[in-house]
Amino acid sequence: MGGTADFVLSITIVLVILIIIAFIWYNFTGWSPFKYSKGNTVTFKTPDESSIAYMRFRNCIFTFTDPKGSLHSIDVTEVLNNMAKGFRDAQNPPSSFTLGGHCQAPLNAFSFVLPGVNDRATVATADDAKKWENCDATLTGLQRII
């Protein structure tokens, strides 16, 4: 009975060590920083032409100023991860995707919406939208292929 218990204990220890190594590998290696500023076309591309569905994002923050000069930030990590995961079931998944889709709109204060600040109801007229033209916007975060 002692031999079986020792075997189970050693297997458990090995599995715990492997889980710790996998956790460290995923969280602390392979993440590449990115930064896009106002006017940049935001395109995420896999380095080896693999499917974009395997790209993951972390700590992605969209920051913008409003016409009054107030600074606003939104965590868009989940949005970007869901955009990439959306290609999982595609017949021929691409190796890149661009914010704005086929329009390839450059990064601006409307690239992501913060309700009550830069949404359609708040920016109701063309004059309101024109005030936003000179507002700064940045998108920063980390990306990796899993």
UniProtKB/Swiss-Prot annotation:
Cystine pairings recorded for this chain: none
Keywords: Host membrane, Membrane, Transmembrane, Transmembrane helix, Virion
Record field: transmembrane: 7-27
Location in the cell: Host membrane; Virion
GO CC annotation terms, alphabetical: host cell membrane; membrane; virion component
Membrane topology: Single-pass membrane protein
Induction details: Expressed in the late phase of the viral replicative cycle.
Primary location recorded for the protein, binned into one broad class: host cell
Family listed: Belongs to the asfivirus E146L family.
Protein name in UniProt: Uncharacterized protein E146L
Species of origin: African swine fever virus (isolate Tick/South Africa/Pretoriuskop Pr4/1996) (ASFV)
Taxonomic classification: Viruses, Varidnaviria, Bamfordvirae, Nucleocytoviricota, Pokkesviricetes
